[in-house]
């Protein structure tokens, strides 16, 4: 949870804890610049995370902007994920936990070399208005390489096989990082 350990263009898996050390949520934090970070919580906990961060920062000059309604996340995971990403014109040659942001003809895109499956993977943060376009393009190219869509159930199976924790399962406000094996 120490952003001083990463530099702009890097992501970090972090735990947002309450005053008692319980895990409010596990999040990815993207350091876009020294004065700009992007926090991606689990969708089910977005309002709780935003409320917690706003409460903690209320007496500071830090501005919190909730983009959960205007942003969509599409994950592309698996051995051919880099080929799929590059086939739609996005950069795929990224080291793990690195990301780039770009403006495209189809809106702003953050391409992150992250994922929650144990496979090589990417997560795209796209403008919600362009999500259908990106989904369609990614799906066509993934299917051409033998890939197919899968939902959170598939992701949950893969993350369980890898031993990755998930809030609401191995993590909760009554479980601290040490108890979860994430210290």
Where are these regions (language model features)?
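Basic, glycine/lysine-rich polyanion-binding surfaces/domains
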Residues: 1-183
């Amino acid at each position: 949870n120490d952003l001083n350990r990463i530099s702009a263009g890097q992501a970090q898996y972090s735990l947002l804890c309450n005053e008692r050390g319980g895990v409010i949520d596990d999040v990815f934090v993207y350091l876009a610049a020294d004065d700009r970070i992007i926090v991606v919580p689990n969708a089910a906990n977005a309002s709780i995370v935003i409320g917690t961060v706003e409460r903690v920062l209320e007496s500071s000059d830090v501005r919190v902007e909730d983009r959960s309604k205007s942003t969509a996340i599409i994950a592309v995971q698996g051995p051919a994920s880099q080929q799929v990403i590059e086939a739609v014109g996005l950069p795929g040659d990224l080291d793990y936990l690195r990301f780039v942001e770009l403006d495209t003809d189809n809106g702003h895109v953050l391409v992150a070399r992250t994922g929650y499956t144990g496979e090589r993977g990417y997560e795209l943060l796209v403008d919600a208005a362009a999500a259908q376009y990106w989904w369609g393009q990614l799906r066509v190219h993934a299917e051409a390489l033998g890939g197919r869509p899968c939902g959170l159930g598939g992701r949950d199976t893969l993350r369980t096989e890898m031993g990755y924790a998930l809030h609401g399962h191995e993590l909760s406000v009554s479980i601290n990082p040490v108890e979860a094996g994430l210290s």
